[in-house]
């Protein structure tokens, strides 16, 4: 029997949630591949991708879950929140309804996620300034009220996309992992569970391929 080699030191499950059409899939595509697709079809159910970061000679594997925003997929997508220790909750700055629905998404995540987690509130499509329906101040106030980080991004022109993901992971690393041992129950499609032990972490230094800023509520 051949044993599989674990190709990472730490595993971090992050979900990207929010209404349909706010740009979740393009945010992930821009972060992972620096690509943007005009007219990209809405996600059906859940899509999955990974990204590995090298920090202090440790490999950090991110599981990035892109969840559908349509109501009919709720029963499917909520099951994938289990074990998540991070979330990007996304709204469209040019769509008031997507902002009004943030409470719903936040509640669903907190009911299903790991007991310790970090959340980044993302006001996407900042390139649509002339059509803005949600002010930057409103986004900041919502984030502060619910103890989240906040940033405005544009998947179209890539503004702040990498910063949004990296600041979230930075917050998780320093606030949840640093000098603390915790076991993460990673649920893989509801079939296989693996326990990843995280502990005794030192302050991180990303290699030259990645930029990390200390977590802040106002980062744009």
UniProtKB/Swiss-Prot annotation:
Give the UniProt subcellular location, in the record's own words.
Cell membrane
Give the lipid-moiety residues, type S-geranylgeranyl cysteine: 219-220
Disruption outcome: Mutants exhibit normal growth and development, and endocytosis and the structure of membrane-bound organelles is unaffected.
User: One short Pfam family name for this protein?
Assistant: Ras
The motif Effector region: which residues?
Answer: 40-48
| GO MF annotation list | GTP binding; GTPase activity; nucleotide binding
Keyword Translocase assigned to the entry: answer is no
TM segments?
A: none
Membrane disposition: Lipid-anchor
Which biological processes are named by the entry's GO terms? hypotonic response; intracellular protein transport; small GTPase-mediated signal transduction
Q: An example Gene Ontology cellular component term from the record?
A: plasma membrane
Protein's recorded name: Ras-related protein Rab-11B
Q: Which organism is it from?
A: Dictyostelium discoideum (Social amoeba)
Query: Mind giving the lineage of the organism this protein is from?
Result: Eukaryota, Amoebozoa, Evosea, Eumycetozoa, Dictyostelia
Q: Which gene encodes it?
A: rab11B
